[in-house]
Amino acid sequence: MSSIVESLLCTRPVCAWAAERWTLTFLGDCGEQIFQEEVPKLVHLLYTCLRSTRQSARRCFVLRAVFLLAHSHPQPVLDSLLQACLPTDSDMVEVWRSLGRSVLGCQILVCLTEKLRAAGKSSHRSECCTRELGSSQAALEPRTITHALCEVVSVLQRKTLVQRLLPSLLPGLLRQVSETLGEELAPSVGDLESADMPGSLFVAALELVLARCLDNRWLRLLREQGAWASLAEPRAHSTGVCLLAR
């Protein structure tokens, strides 16, 4: 299987086309027969293929192949994607949105929600390990998961699932906001966020999640009361939490 996927990087159109057809057929019919230890390599090769082309048809093929592989091996594929590169990379954003729009969207959101919850518990239990690894590396995983979660939520068709997962999403994201307030992040990790405040990514994720669950009038009220700005400000964080709890 790996040798076939590697041939996708071939510059000869006929060879690449044949490899694409074979790969989709194999993944659709025999994807479950792929050993899990091979999945990370396949994901890496497919992602390399995606980044190397701007051709619409070829990019559609890669996204379809990732979907088929995720259908057979959801957890290994998600883990590989989360470790692939910067989550704000435009190609990675396209991958997450493609999966979010697919029939796997609900399953993927459930998995990402659980991963965010587990990441929060893990970081709380292993403060000494965090110091050894460095704050930037320790902070990377929750941010990567949250970036992926935001892309999936933004395109997910079923709002009811977001509502059902809210009891897990809300405390998980709030915990990350609380833990990151006041931290001095390394530039490589700080660049993952568009704003200056360390917790801005998680606050934006909270706003996005609640936008899929609440009526517009409640969202407008939260904005008017300054809930999001308060959450991201260390001295006003508790006020922001109280506004959400009302």
Regions found by a protein language model. Give the residues of each.
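HEAT/HEAT-like alpha-solenoid repeats
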Residues: M1-L8, F26, Q33-L50, S72-D91, ...
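HEAT-repeat alpha-solenoid elements in large eukaryotic scaffold proteins
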Residues: P13-L27, L42, T53-R59, P74, ...
